């Protein structure tokens, strides 16, 4: 018989954050590494485009703060989701693993939000 009151799963929320973090890490993060780690040090990017004043103005704008927040938080959720499922696959039992890994991701997300908003 079909259960008339099925238990709702919270897994789609975590899979959504995992997918968003993986996509961000695959598309946006390599561009930032190329730009900040290769093009700027080699002098291949216009120097005035990435002056301290312009970068600071961007980082203090709403869009800049959102970008910095997403640059930190989405890969964080992706990584902790991967670690959570890797522990399961390796048959390493972490007591309350869902609370440990997703709770850590949530706590670090709040810390990042506070840091991005107030610093």
Swiss-Prot record:
Species this protein is from: Klebsiella pneumoniae subsp. pneumoniae (strain ATCC 700721 / MGH 78578)
Gene: frdD
Family, per entry: Belongs to the FrdD family.
GO cellular component: fumarate reductase complex; plasma membrane
Pfam families: Fumarate_red_D
TM annotation in the entry: 24-44, 55-75, 99-119
Function field: Two distinct, membrane-bound, FAD-containing enzymes are responsible for the catalysis of fumarate and succinate interconversion; fumarate reductase is used in anaerobic growth, and succinate dehydrogenase is used in aerobic growth. Anchors the catalytic components of the fumarate reductase complex to the cell inner membrane, binds quinones.
Protein name: Fumarate reductase subunit D
Membrane topology: Multi-pass membrane protein
Subunit structure: Part of an enzyme complex containing four subunits: a flavoprotein (FrdA), an iron-sulfur protein (FrdB), and two hydrophobic anchor proteins (FrdC and FrdD).
One term of GO molecular function: succinate dehydrogenase activity
Classification via InterPro entries: Fumarate_red_D, SQR/QFR_C/D
Origin superkingdom: Bacteria
Main location: membrane
Protein localization: Cell inner membrane
Keywords of the record: Cell inner membrane, Cell membrane, Membrane, Transmembrane, Transmembrane helix
One annotated GO biological process: fumarate metabolic process
């Amino acid at each position: 018989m079909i259960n008339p009151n099925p238990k709702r799963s919270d897994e789609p929320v975590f899979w959504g954050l995992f997918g968003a973090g993986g996509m961000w890490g695959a598309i946006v993060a390599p561009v930032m590494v190329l730009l900040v780690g290769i093009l700027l040090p080699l002098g291949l990017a216009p120097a005035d485009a990435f002056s301290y004043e312009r970068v600071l103005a961007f980082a203090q704008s709403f869009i800049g703060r959102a970008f910095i927040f997403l640059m930190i938080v989405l890969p964080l959720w992706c990584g902790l989701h991967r670690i959570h499922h890797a522990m399961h696959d390796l048959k390493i039992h972490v007591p309350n693993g869902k609370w440990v890994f997703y709770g850590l991701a949530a706590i670090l997300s709040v810390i990042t939000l506070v840091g991005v908003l107030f610093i």
